[in-house]
A protein has these predicted regions:
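Extended, charge-rich low-complexity interaction segments
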Residues: 534-567
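Membrane-embedded hairpin module used as a gating/binding unit in multi-pass transport
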Residues: 356-452
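Glycine-rich, charge-decorated loop segments at or immediately adjacent to ligand/cofactor-binding or catalytic sites
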Residues: 514-532
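Proline-aspartate-enriched helix->loop->beta-strand connector
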Residues: 475-476, 480
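Short Gly/Thr/Asp-enriched flexible loops that form oxyanion-binding sites at enzyme active sites
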Residues: 489-501
Length: 617
């Protein structure tokens, strides 16, 4: 792809290579040259040899003496009028500061009354400060200004008072402990045992025309080595108290148990794309990830079979999630009726605004391509169905929410992308970047913006422009852009970063990249990037949650954004994925903060599955 004059200037000392076939006799312009950003890969693959290649600054304005094909390096033998190379400008040495002297008297300011009754004061030293004060406000037509020592003048302006932190929202999670799950004649909670009504399966099947079969299992820790179809979602079991709405008031949540949805279509095809996590549960779950189960938890696992060939259509996964929520909602209704004796802990979350600190926003890109790629936003109940809107139906445009709405289950994730980088519903309930930013006293988190990733490129750029304007209106000092998955959604992921960056706002991007998810698009604003990869080989290994955003990425991203907002240098990444970059950055942050960063395990800590053995390891 050809470059612009601006790019040519920025890459003046990089190799000059034709982007397209060029006829003899033309004068070389930026439009004739290829973007140097792609050269490393071409050289590595043997498609490009840069030996003897001139630089961009040398060839601009020169005459091509021979017709050349695309990707032809420009050398002396095909050009006439090559310019002499220049040395890259070196940084100027800092000027030595003059010795501090006693503060001299400030020069006498001149004052004059002008037509219209305005007093003009001009101070010639410093930055040519001009003050205009209505004479009437002074009660005089102008007086000589007394000479004031400069040191005194410098302190004349009173310091602006520092505004105090302000709590703009509180959310209380009320924890109910569950140690056992059984089937019984009715859904109820007795002590620490949850009973699920026998026969509820028939209602799940009857609720949705596309649901053809449903099987409910209770998986206890001693049954983790049980075969399962691909895991579509992991969900907390939570409900609002009284009239409280999402993100406010009190939310009751069951500890020790999660909902797990799995499924196929009638033909046995997994409901997933670019990988699936079917197999033994203990071999295919990355325990403790924000979106995954924790070891020791009980799974209420529902396996749904949808109509054949609807697994890749929008209606198939939607029907599966909607039907499965019948069970969760019945549990929610029981939770609402429990008295406070069942509450074992109250956890208070606060949304705090910090005036005077750097204001930041988190932009989270979620899937919105249609088919199986969709999400429900802002249901009535945490991670519920009722009242929610699909982001595809909303046009994938930005939706602004509070941090507490995120942590209260405002996203019901329908997405069936590759398991390793999929952010499940529970991920948002425990969203690590939101939690890190909320608790960091050095930044002012103003909110979270969810934006869908459309399928069509024109729609992607339309949505990205909305993101840019939304963030600009917030008047923030910095932004994060995160995404799950990789591939098609990286087009708008890069565009979001560009739209924010071009408005002068430093922005840090977070995504699974590494080897398999390496970005195929980019722009000059993508200079601050954090890779979510944790897999040994840098790939989508089909282990649930392996390469999702964790606390360690939240810490690294915050450190990088702070550096960017302060104007500090952030070194460019190496041209190939190198896991040592992450470890080096972690060590630097630990040294600066004096605090150990706990890194999570990867798939090597799990028993080896047959799939991993055959396909990956």
């Amino acid at each position: 792809m050809s470059i612009t004059a601006e790019t040519a200037k920025a890459h003046a000392h990089d190799p000059a290579v034709l982007c397209c076939r060029a006829e003899a006799g033309i004068t070389i312009e930026p439009a004739n040259l290829e973007d140097p950003a792609i050269f490393d890969d071409l050289v590595d693959s043997g498609l490009l040899n840069l030996d003897g290649c001139l630089t961009i600054e040398e060839v601009l304005g020169a005459k091509l003496t021979k017709t050349c094909d695309s990707l032809c390096p420009l050398t002396d033998d095909v050009l006439d009028g090559v310019k002499a190379p220049t040395t890259p400008a070196e940084e100027k040495a800092e000027e030595e500061a003059p010795a501090e002297e006693a503060a001299p008297a400030a020069p006498v300011a001149t004052a004059a009354t002008v037509a219209g009754g305005t007093l003009k004061i001009h101070i010639g030293e410093g930055k040519d400060i001009n003050l205009e004060i209505p004479v009437g406000a002074l009660g005089t037509t102008g007086e000589a200004v007394a000479e004031v020592p400069a040191a005194v003048a410098a302190t004349a302006t009173a310091e602006a008072p520092v505004e105090e932190e302000k709590v703009v929202g509180t959310l209380t999670r009320r924890h109910i402990k569950i140690t056992d799950v059984q089937r019984g004649p009715e859904t109820k909670i007795e002590g620490t045992t949850l009973y699920i009504r026998e026969g509820i399966e028939a209602e799940v099947i009857a609720d949705q025309e596309l649901v053809k079969d449903f099987h409910l299992e209770i998986i206890t820790p001693d049954q983790y080595h049980t075969y399962s179809e691909t895991i579509m979602d992991v969900q907390p079991i939570a409900t609002k108290e009284g009239d409280a709405i999402l993100g406010e008031g009190a939310t009751r949540v069951l500890d020790g148990v999660v909902m797990m949805l799995t499924g196929t279509d009638e033909g046995g095809v997994q409901i997933g794309e670019f990988g699936s996590s079917e197999g033994y549960l203990d071999e295919n779950i990355m325990w403790g990830r924000p979106g995954c189960p924790d070891k020791g938890e009980i799974f209420i696992k529902g396996n749904i079979v949808v109509q054949e060939k609807t697994n890749m259509e929008r209606r198939g996964p939607m029907a599966a999630h909607t039907a499965f929520d019948i069970i969760t909602q019945e549990i929610r209704e029981v939770m609402k009726e429990l008295d406070d004796s069942f509450i074992v802990e109250d956890e208070e979350l606060k949304s705090i605004r910090r005036p005077g600190k750097k204001k930041v926003v988190i932009v989270k890109e979620i899937m919105g391509q249609g088919a199986m790629h969709d999400n429900f936003i802002l249901p009535v109940e945490p991670v519920g169905i009722l009242g929610a809107r699909a982001n595809v139906d909303l046009g994938n445009v930005p939706v602004c929410v509070s941090p507490l709405e995120v942590l209260d289950g405002c996203i019901h994730a329908l997405t069936c992308i590759g398991p390793a980088s999929k952010e499940m519903s529970r991920h948002y309930w425990r969203e690590p970047l939101v939690l890190e930013a909320l608790h960091d006293e050095e930044v002012d988190l103003c909110g979270v913006v969810f934006v869908g990733s459309p399928q069509i490129n024109a729609e992607k750029y339309y949505v990205s422009r909305r993101v840019g304007h939304t963030v600009e209106m917030m008047d923030v000092d910095g932004a994060f852009v995160t995404t799950e998955g990789f591939g098609n959604n990286h087009i708008d992921f890069a565009s979001h970063i560009e739209q924010i960056g071009m408005r002068g706002i430093p922005v840090v991007g977070l995504s699974f990249c590494a080897v398999q998810g390496a970005l195929v698009v980019g722009n000059k604003y993508m200079q601050y990037m954090v890779d979510n990869n944790k897999s040994e080989s840098g790939i989508e290994n089909e282990v649930l949650g392996c390469n999702t955003l964790c606390q360690e990425e939240g810490i690294r991203a915050l450190a990088m954004l702070k550096a960017a907002m302060a104007g500090e240098e952030v070194k460019a990444a190496e041209k190939k994925w190198n896991p040592n970059v992450k470890s080096t950055n972690v060590e630097l942050i630990e040294a600066a903060c004096g605090k150990k960063i706990e890194l999570v395990d990867n798939e090597q800590s799990l028993p080896m599955s047959q799939k991993r053995k055959e396909k990956y390891d």
